[in-house]
């Protein structure tokens, strides 16, 4: 198998994947549409909030970037795609960046050598099969290989996955992807190989299972709090049962961030389209919202300090942050709220909420 790998889209996730691949001996070419960003990679001046990215880039000898799609195609027959697929207002994922790349590939005609196009971003179930139908005549094998990572620990999460999920119609393609990970990872993950649509369902369903567990945890915690019980003692006992497990059973803030909420909604939307309502998807979102309101309603006092308003520690993202939503809810009911976080985070919050809070870094 070739030692060269091309990655289309070297943003927060893609650049980490590129650096991890380079570290284990691959030559990696990143293709991105932003010239200044590409320059920052090639000049090793990229600034990143992800742990180890800047130091790994400084040491990397075989990772470069370009804006040239043709160069990316010529460099390797293994093409990973890690562009953004943000959520649309209807709850589905926006595939426009993948579609834009696919149209560019189609314009370049049929490839002499079969190329593996590996979609690593989250897609709606059925999308990769549709993409395969569009690209098959141009000699592409489309596979699906999403990553289960968390913002702030992407480098480590890619090296120590619990599961490597591969969706492919082609056994040879699936084995190529597996081979990349066998060289990359530093643990012994489960390799789950299935059809693309199965993998697409699996990706969002796995995250939805976690959101449901978090919502259930907080629901029981709220109930215990209301009747004078001991929330965490109850939850620790529940988590001690091996059928449940102790992960995600700490009573506290609900789920938020760029992945869990949108995956939960997307699964519900997709199921309804198939006339297979997954009521638990809607119920989980409702429980998450109810828990936030419970926390706000049960706060007693005139002032509070909220330390850390990103959706999770070691992240710079405030997207659907329950910590921030809690602070907003308290401030709107007259509580004096002081926020403590990194200057960059506070600057973003202040640009949205102005003088609603007192800010302290």
Regions found by a protein language model. Give the residues of each.
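Structural/interface elements that position substrates and couple domains in central-metabolism enzymes
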Residues: 2-361
């Amino acid at each position: 198998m070739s030692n060269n790998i091309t990655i289309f889209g070297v943003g927060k996730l893609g650049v980490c994947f590129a650096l991890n691949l380079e570290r284990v001996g691959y030559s990696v070419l990143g293709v991105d549409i932003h010239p200044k960003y590409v320059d920052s990679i090639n000049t090793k001046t990229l600034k990143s909030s992800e742990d180890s990215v800047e130091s790994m880039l400084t040491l990397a000898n075989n990772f470069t970037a370009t804006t040239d799609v043709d160069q990316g195609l010529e460099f390797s027959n293994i093409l990973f795609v890690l562009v953004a697929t943000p959520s649309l207002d209807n709850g589905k994922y926006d595939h426009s960046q993948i579609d834009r790349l696919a149209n560019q590939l189609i314009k370049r005609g049929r490839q002499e050598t079969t190329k593996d196009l590996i979609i690593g971003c989250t897609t709606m179930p059925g999308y990769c099969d549709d993409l395969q139908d569009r690209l098959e005549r141009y000699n592409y094998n489309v596979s699906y290989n999403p990553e289960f990572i968390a913002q702030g620990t992407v480098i480590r999460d890619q090296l120590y996955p619990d599961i490597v999920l591969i969706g492919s119609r082609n056994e040879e393609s699936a084995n190529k992807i597996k081979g990349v990970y066998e060289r990359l990872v530093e643990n012994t993950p489960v390799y789950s190989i299935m059809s693309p649509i199965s993998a697409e369902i699996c990706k969002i369903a796995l995250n939805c299972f976690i959101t449901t567990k978090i919502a259930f945890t907080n629901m029981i915690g709220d109930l215990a709090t209301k009747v004078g019980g001991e929330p965490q003692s109850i939850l620790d006992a529940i988590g001690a049962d091996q059928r449940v497990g102790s992960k995600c059973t700490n009573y506290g803030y609900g789920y938020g961030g760029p992945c869990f909420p949108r995956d939960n909604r997307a699964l519900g939307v997709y199921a309804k389209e198939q006339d297979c309502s997954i009521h638990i998807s809607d119920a989980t979102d409702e429980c998450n919202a109810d828990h936030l309101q419970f926390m706000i309603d049960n706060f007693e006092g005139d002032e509070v300090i909220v330390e850390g308003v990103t959706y999770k520690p070691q992240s710079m993202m405030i997207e659907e942050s329950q910590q921030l939503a809690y602070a907003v809810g308290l401030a709107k009911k007259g509580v004096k709220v002081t926020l403590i976080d990194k200057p960059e985070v506070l600057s973003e919050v202040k640009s949205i909420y102005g003088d609603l809070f007192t800010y302290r870094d």
